[in-house]
Amino acid sequence: MPGVVAGIGTAVWTAYLALFPALAGWLATRWTARGSLARALAAAALWTLAEWTRSTGYTGFPWLVLGNSQLPVPAGWASPLAGYAPLGGVWLVTLALALCAGALALAVDAFAAPARGRAL
């Protein structure tokens, strides 16, 4: 029985923590137009806010933040975005990485836009 309870508890906790990025994505799509620069900026800002909110308060999970993936590792490798960490901490690195992802999404969307609606 304890294994079943632990499994249910883990599933509920995981679903709760997934609400933060889900809410950020829903708000970004609700407030902005598809393929716009405003959506990329809003999504990056809301994602950063969602991660900050998830890592403070009751939940307090400051690990698995997107910006942590860019910080130096013991082997000496570091992303160019790690240079923003002294200026604004992991949150600025998270925002910079989310902005890069938004720019990439806009580029892919602009490249694929002429092909939309055409039959193969």
How would you describe each model-predicted region?
Residues 1-120:
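Membrane-embedded alpha-helical bundles of multi-pass enzymes
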